[in-house]
Amino acid sequence: MAAMADKVVVKKTTTRRRGRSNSRSRSRSRSRSRTKKTVKIIEKKPEKSILKKIDQAERRDAKQLRRIRKKVQGPPVNSRMTTVVTLGQITGNKDNTLERKHKCFLNPLLMKSQETGQTATPLSVRASQYNLWKLSRLHVRLIPLAGKANILGSVVFLDLEQEANTAGPESVDTIKARPHVEVPIGSKTVWKVHPRSALGPRQGWWNVDPGDSPTDSLGPALNMWTYLQTVNALQSAGGTQTPYTSALFLVEVLVTYEFSNYGPKPALSQMVSDSFPPASGSTATLKNTSDGAVAIQLSGAIARKMEEVEPKGRRSNAQTSGVGEVFWAVSTEVVNTVADAIPGWGWLLKGGWFVLRKIFGAANDQNGTYLIYSSVADAQGDNRIYTSVKQTQLTSSRINLVQLTQPNVNQAAVGGSVGAANSIYLPLPQADDQYTPYFVYNFQGERVSTTETGVFCLAAIPAATTSSRYNNQITTPSIGYRNASGTGTSFLLDAASWWNILDVTQTGVLFGQPRLGVGVMQTMKTLKQHIKDYTEPAIQKYYPGTTNLDEQLKQRLNLAEGDPVISMGDTNGRRAALFYRTSDEKYILFFSTTEDPGAQYQNLKMLYFWNWSYSDTKQQFLDHLRTVQFANLDDSQPAPYDSDDDDLSDVTSLFEQADLGDETDFKFNMSIQTSKHLEEEKNYWKNQCERMMMEKALSGTSQPLVRFEKAGPRADQSSASGHS
């Protein structure tokens, strides 16, 4: 239409004039024509196209729309970051159930690998500098780590959970009702999640700091699941295929985050995101608190990691009572038998995700007790779960731990630790719980076997009560335990009439054997990490069936079958036993004396107790025992220093070339014979002495004071003058 409107219009017109009559009677002039034709060319101005008018109107409307959006859609984007984050592995499933492998919040502070720990990432550092975030791109990549030809039986699910801060019953149907992707084993997949699925509550924006409002900060979460048992087709045991629990996929995400409202909070970049495999000494046990709330008691590496962020009440600046300020998210695999330990709340454990908050107090600090919540909102309001639970081990599989809040956001972390303060280490019973690599170890942190006698020594000032002293003659006393095959056996104690049950929990320490030279290796608190490690030869399981003690004495000991027991002996060769009573987590030292220790134990003088090998006799125990570290055992006696004097005197050395070796200095070796400066110094003083002696001789002295003779090959020739 625009082309047609711009055409030039040519208009042809013919003008006819009324002529005269064609009468022949009138002559016709040659100068006059009969008909006059004219052609007019009219060029019209091109009219505006209708489409151009529409385009102008659209541009005007878009400009007005942008102005309106600036008013209603929040702050502008101040920073944008695109990066790839490796979230971790998806492993195989050992049962025919739905197992959660990980739950990763889309908050950029929490978008970390499962093994990052407390290390800052580029994304978390950028996010800690702003107050608002939103996600404009999310591509999830699954890289296969196992082939589909050999690994069979399972399917992997990924889903995006909008209401991620609340736990709920989970099944395959609930996963498929959300935005999800289903991936068979061995397939490389890229899942492109639409950004509208991650819009925040404030015109698409979320808060960065979860401590402000966790429900408005954490955002959606990416869940990773494995459904049905994973088996290895190439392996079988007893006719059945072996479950495959190793890695199936590596999960990576390509993300683009937008940030706004600059406000740096350095400590947010180093919130904990860690994974803890099952290990000896690490436990997670369900229990009830004193008010009946459901809690979990943690020990081992996961408890130490949480206490680094939230220290115990023994520190000068630490919380001493109430509920902690840090929220923790735990995701793990929970079997159905364990889920039944919480009546009515089994779905919470089956879902494999819940929130924890530490409960402070003297008893809770010692045990590492954390309250369980079903959502972040319940944790924020301290809405506890009240039901009677069975005290049972929660899980024996990997536990993923994520720190959701950070109370002190403006304290920059130093050396990978957020909010670390100077701890009170002394007195030793009040020292912070520390990590020790093994039961007995050397300076390199290497394990030292406890098979031999005298590998470690117990020293303590024990605590006693009125029931600690027991008087009755026992002729063949013994302590029963189960050996490696599970058979009940025992080790004998000395026959005696006085028996002592002393508590060494507070003051007991373990020394390494003298040849190690490590000194104190464990307190009774750190020993809890290893006291249930029955792979150590020194630690056995108590068995009352083969224990020969008075029944009243057994009742006072109050031991349960399976409690750890260690064979000990003092330096006099009197055998004893060290028990760890699991009912109240006390260390009990049990031994006999030949005389009454006294009503208040005023007559007892404590000795050191050393570990006694179960296969050693009393004489072998005493022969192996070493109580002094002899440092120069392999050193030879140093040779006496030879201080032979030189034949030349100090004065003569100024004039003669002494046969001296190279003398070692702190920077270099200097040769006296070849030193130019020393040669000049010697000649100067020689000339001075010659001049002084000559002046003295010429002053009238009858006898020469000094006779100078030449050295060298001509030394045997006498001087002609007798004087220089």
Curated annotation (Swiss-Prot):
Spell out the protein name for this chain.
Capsid polyprotein VP90
Note on domains (UniProt): Contains the P2 globular region.
Compartments annotated for it: namely: Virion
Enumerate the residue ranges of region (Acidic).
Answer: 630-724
Post-translational changes noted in the entry:
Specific enzymatic cleavages by the host yield mature proteins.
Q: Which Pfam families match?
A: Astro_capsid_N (PF03115), Astro_capsid_p2 (PF16580)
Q: Which UniProt keywords apply?
A: Capsid protein, Host-virus interaction, Inhibition of host complement factors by virus, T=1 icosahedral capsid protein, Viral immunoevasion, Virion
GO biological processes: symbiont-mediated suppression of host complement activation
Q: Which organism is it from?
A: Turkey astrovirus 2 (TAstV-2)
| Chain intervals for the UniProt region annotation (Disordered) | 1-39, 700-724
Q: Which GO terms describe its cellular component?
A: T=1 icosahedral viral capsid
Query: Its biological function?
Result: Self-assembles to form an icosahedral T=3 immature capsid.
